[in-house]
């Protein structure tokens, strides 16, 4: 009965999100595998040289642009973080994070799932040049995790899918805070003041309920530039922009014109092809329906396929390729063990222990329809760090620590793969056990 209520409570938006993210996870995996194959083939020199190719335009001796790798990591990933920011805002206002009662359990779970892996890594790498990589195993890749959980189908309770999504959103918010606090260097306050001025303009547009996305996006580009120049990673600008996008729907949302257009279409004669009148009516319905959506919904709807099917796969292909040969020093400090143990052990233990303790102390309440065994399974899948972990590894290790970065990437791939396989087998076995009891 509770399971049925949970199923009904799952909104259409959330269902669409699950479907798109699950396919995106599979597509991400294929691109990661392709990157590893190419990076260890006769094409490896071309593969690595490609990402250092400068792209931009030149005026005399002045060049405006970046290497292809920086375009992906700094510009395209800003669009990904913009979408993440929109998802977080939506969940904070209307979703599973909209009240303390709803949010407390997954938020505390996310907190435990970040602290435990970070501590494991830091403990193993304390007082070494690699200790700055503690943020790497703290992340969860929602696309991969949902890809695995959706492959299990009905063997996984819907309530667990909702919990994993909410946990991952809270985890993303935590990752953004970690990036802002610990992976920011050489702050330039003049540019920060410029960024603050742009944020105030965005807040004014939001206050005026400006529904056109164009001014927000134009100011967003300016904000990205100011933040990029300030020393803070530019993806933070995208998250700030997301929180400034209006979420209110227009007051005339119960638009009678839309109903009238529907009636007009129903009254037209049907044939093998649409008539000109029917095409015009459908076009008007499309325009009216779009106008009823909030700017946040429109932008999120636009970014979701671009992020899932282009940006993230491209990021995976550009960053997952590591040439595994004798030149790699797998004994760089304890990076390999720190990342793998953080993802495979720290994530599930952190999530399980902190939620178990918080419920016993009556701070939170476990969602109906899922057992503690399910929570442990979700913790295992949360150990799939992949793209977010890769992103943080690029921030944690500069070109001076190339060995550590390469080892971290291998560890992320291994740790994510182990977590995914163990998590899937565990939830499959859990379902079989429940079926036998029946």
Curated annotation (Swiss-Prot):
One of its GO terms (biological process) is regulation of pH. The keyword Cell membrane applies. The chain crosses the membrane at residues 23-43, 62-82, 104-124, 133-153, 162-182, 185-205, 221-241, 302-322, 337-357, 372-392, 410-430. It is found in: Cell inner membrane. Keywords: Antiport, Cell inner membrane, Cell membrane, Ion transport, Membrane, Sodium, Sodium transport, Transmembrane, Transmembrane helix, Transport. The keyword Transmembrane applies. It is a multi-pass membrane protein. InterPro entries: Na/H_antiporter_dom_sf (IPR023171), NhaA (IPR004670). GO terms for cellular component: plasma membrane. Belongs to the NhaA Na(+)/H(+) (TC 2.A.33) antiporter family. PANTHER family: NA(+)_H(+) ANTIPORTER NHAA, SODIUM ION/PROTON ANTIPORTER NHAA-RELATED. Na(+)/H(+) antiporter that extrudes sodium in exchange for external protons. This is Na(+)/H(+) antiporter NhaA. It comes from Helicobacter pylori (strain P12). The gene is nhaA.
């Amino acid at each position: 009965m509770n399971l049925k209520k949970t199923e009904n409570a799952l909104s259409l938006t959330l269902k669409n999100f699950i479907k798109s993210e699950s396919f995106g996870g599979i597509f991400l995996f294929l691109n990661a595998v392709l990157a590893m194959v190419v990076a260890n083939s006769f094409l490896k020199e071309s593969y690595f040289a490609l990402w250092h190719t400068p792209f931009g335009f030149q005026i005399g001796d002045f060049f405006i642009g970046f290497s292809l790798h920086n375009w992906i990591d700094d510009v395209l990933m800003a669009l990904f973080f913009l979408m993440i920011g929109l998802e977080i805002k939506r969940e904070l206002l209307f979703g599973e994070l909209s009240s303390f009662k709803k949010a407390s359990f997954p938020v505390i779970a996310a907190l435990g799932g970040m602290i435990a892996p970070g501590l494991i890594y830091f403990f193993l790498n304390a007082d070494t040049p690699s200790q700055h990589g503690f943020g790497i195993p703290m992340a969860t890749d929602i696309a991969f995790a949902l890809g695995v959980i959706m492959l299990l189908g009905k063997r996984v309770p819907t309530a667990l899918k909702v919990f994993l999504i909410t946990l991952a959103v809270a985890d993303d918010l935590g990752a953004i805070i970690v990036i802002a606090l610990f992976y920011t260097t050489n702050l330039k306050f003049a540019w920060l003041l410029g960024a603050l001025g742009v944020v105030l303009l965005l807040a004014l547009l939001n206050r005026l309920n400006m529904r056109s996305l164009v001014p927000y996006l134009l100011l967003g580009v300016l904000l990205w530039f100011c933040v990029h120049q300030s020393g803070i990673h530019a993806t933070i600008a995208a998250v700030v922009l997301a929180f400034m996008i209006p979420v209110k729907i227009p007051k005339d949302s119960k638009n009678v014109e839309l109903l009238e257009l529907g009636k007009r279409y129903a009254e037209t004669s049907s044939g093998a092809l649409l008539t000109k009148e029917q095409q015009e009516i459908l076009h008007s319905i499309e325009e009216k329906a779009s106008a009823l959506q909030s700017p946040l919904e429109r932008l999120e709807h636009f970014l979701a396929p671009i992020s899932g099917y282009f940006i993230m796969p491209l990021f995976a292909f550009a960053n997952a390729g590591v040439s595994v040969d004798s030149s790699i020093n797998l004994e760089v400090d304890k990076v390999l063990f720190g990342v793998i143990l953080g993802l495979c052990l720290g994530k599930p233990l952190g999530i399980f222990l902190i939620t178990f303790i918080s419920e016993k102390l009556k701070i939170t309440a476990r969602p109906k329809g899922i057992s503690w065994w399910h929570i442990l399974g979700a913790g295992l899948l949360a150990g799939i760090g992949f793209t977010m972990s890769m992103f943080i590894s690029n921030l944690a290790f500069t070109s001076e620590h190339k060995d550590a970065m390469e080892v971290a990437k291998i560890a992320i791939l291994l740790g994510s793969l182990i977590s995914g396989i163990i998590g899937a087998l565990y939830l499959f076995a859990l379902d079989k056990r429940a079926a036998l009891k029946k």
